[in-house]
């Protein structure tokens, strides 16, 4: 082997070793106790190198280290790069930390980036009920009705967990409440699936009431019969049967229609400018 080839191979090996140490330092797995992120980068660690499935920027978001996220971006980390799971750093940040989300968005992160299952960061923020991340993403142009591989929206993801705070924010931004996924489920039916497992709390009940106000009318029965899992809970089955049997009133259907006609914007601001009495504005905003 020529000396020049040996030097190249040694250089690559050294850089790889530094980059691996960078990942471990960010994750606080310190093989070298005195390592720090800035020194490793200065020494030649590649801020865009992938180790296994991990990239440094994604790892910093996983541990909610906003200062490290900003440092990596300043040193050239690719803000929209995909890791081994086809996820961007923003997907991880959206689950955990608003500060990381804000830094990534400031550096040009795509709020509508898709992972391998076509999930957006907003799907994950809604699922984890990270309400401030939900709001930050929506304010930065995230699509409130983005569809994943199953045609589920962020509202569906929030509803299946009974995440009242995230559901409320998504509805404020005009999320479509009557969306149907590929197997016939709606946001409110996803929430019912949680309630029938006996996992509902007062917050989940409030979430159901909010979705019910938003949708106006919903139907869970097939050929006049409630799903078997609902029928196992007589009290819940009776309540849902009454709600499904009652036709939507003109008032509730008009609310849904007006909200939808306002389009994809922050509805509290849009409704504020309408020439309506305060009581009707509150009604449109699902406050009663």
UniProtKB/Swiss-Prot annotation:
InterPro entries referenced in this protein's UniProt entry, alphabetically: Ankyrin_rpt, Ankyrin_rpt-contain_sf, ASB8_SOCS, SOCS_box, SOCS_box-like_dom_sf
UniProt GO cellular component terms: cytoplasm
Self-association state and partner proteins as the record states: Interacts with TBK1; this interaction promotes TBK1 proteasomal degradation.
ANK repeats: 52-81, 85-113, 117-146, 150-179
Family the entry assigns: Belongs to the ankyrin SOCS box (ASB) family.
Keywords: ANK repeat, Cytoplasm, Phosphoprotein, Repeat, Ubl conjugation pathway
Reported modifications of this chain: Phosphorylated by TBK1.
Record-linked PANTHER family: ANKYRIN REPEAT AND SOCS BOX PROTEIN 8 (PTHR24134:SF9), ANKYRIN REPEAT-CONTAINING PROTEIN DDB_G0279043 (PTHR24134)
Matches recorded under SUPFAM superfamilies: Ankyrin repeat (SSF48403), SOCS box-like (SSF158235)
Domain spans labelled SOCS box: 235-288
Domains: entry comment: The SOCS box domain mediates the interaction with the Elongin BC complex, an adapter module in different E3 ubiquitin-protein ligase complexes.
High-level lineage: Eukaryota, Metazoa, Chordata, Craniata, Vertebrata
Modified residues (Phosphoserine): 17
Protein's job: May be a substrate-recognition component of a SCF-like ECS (Elongin-Cullin-SOCS-box protein) E3 ubiquitin-protein ligase complex which mediates the ubiquitination and subsequent proteasomal degradation of target proteins. Inhibits IFN-beta production through the IRF3 signaling pathway by targeting TBK1 via 'Lys-48'-linked ubiquitination, leading to its proteasomal degradation.
Cellular localization per UniProt: Cytoplasm
Source organism per UniProt: Pongo abelii (Sumatran orangutan)
UniProt record, GO biological process: intracellular signal transduction; protein ubiquitination
Protein name: Ankyrin repeat and SOCS box protein 8
Main location: cytoplasm
Listed pathway(s): Protein modification; protein ubiquitination
């Amino acid at each position: 082997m020529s000396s020049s080839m040996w030097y190249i191979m040694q250089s690559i090996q050294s850089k790889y070793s530094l980059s691996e140490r960078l990942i471990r330092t960010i994750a606080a797995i310190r093989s070298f106790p005195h390592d720090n992120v800035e020194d490793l980068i200065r020494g030649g660690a590649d801020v865009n190198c992938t180790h296994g499935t991990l990239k440094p920027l994604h790892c910093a978001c996983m541990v909610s280290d906003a200062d490290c996220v900003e440092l990596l971006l300043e040193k050239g980390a690719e803000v929209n790069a995909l890791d081994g799971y086809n996820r961007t750093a923003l997907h991880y940040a959206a689950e955990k930390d608003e500060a990381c989300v804000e830094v990534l968005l400031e550096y040009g992160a795509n709020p509508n980036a898709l992972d391998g299952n076509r999930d957006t960061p907003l799907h994950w923020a809604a699922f984890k009920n990270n309400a401030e991340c939900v709001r930050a993403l929506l304010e930065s142009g995230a699509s409130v009705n983005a569809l994943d591989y199953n045609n589920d929206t962020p509202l569906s993801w929030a509803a299946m967990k009974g995440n009242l705070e995230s559901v409320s924010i998504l509805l404020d931004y005009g999320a479509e409440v009557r969306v149907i996924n590929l197997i016939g489920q709606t946001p409110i039916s996803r929430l019912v699936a949680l309630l029938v497992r006996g996992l509902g709390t007062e917050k989940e009940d409030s979430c159901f009431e909010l979705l019910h106000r938003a949708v106006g009318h919903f139907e869970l029965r097939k050929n006049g019969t409630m799903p078997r899992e609902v029928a196992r809970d007589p009290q819940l089955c009776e309540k849902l049967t009454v709600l499904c049997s009652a036709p939507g009133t003109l008032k509730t259907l008009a609310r849904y229609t007006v909200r939808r006609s306002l389009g994809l914007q922050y509805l509290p601001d849009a409704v504020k400018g309408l020439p309506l009495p305060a009581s009707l504005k509150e009604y449109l905003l699902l406050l009663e």
